[in-house]
Amino acid sequence: SRCNYARLYLNDRYQGVYVNVERIDESFIKSRFGSPIGQLYKVEGGPASNLGYVGNDPANYRNAFEPKTDQADQGYAELIKFIGGIAPGDSTVNAQPLESMFALDDFLQTMAVMLYAGAFDQLTGWSPHNYYLYRHPKTGRWHFIPWDLDVGFADHAFGKVPVIDGWNAAWPI
């Protein structure tokens, strides 16, 4: 998403500089994928948030995958089919090639940057969350959209977990 810095004033009183971040919603989807429709889920942790298959019951996915569009709110069948298709092991849920159902190149490039940056507050972390999944209605492909990238390029994630040796988060950009 796009972002910029904004000086915030409340009642003519300066509050500081804040980050103004574009929301991931139908407007975002339309600007990136050409149409505001499709299944969009926000992932905030819980069972299956690591894209692990936990069966065919939609109730197993509701806590982790919050519907953000009407199409996503209509059911979890396509999401479950996707997760079952990428699950390791002998999954009979979906036998499609991964590239036909997932924007794999974009995902791998994003993962490379996130792992290098120590973005452990994401799918790459110990408690996967802070991302969206979007399924394009025409292509049927799923797209990974990272979100809330505030824990990265730090010497220690959450003040405890070493991330990058020799990095100092206080260095100027």
Give residue spans per PLM region.
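Phosphate/dinucleotide-binding and metal-coordinating scaffold of catalytic cores
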Residues: 1-173
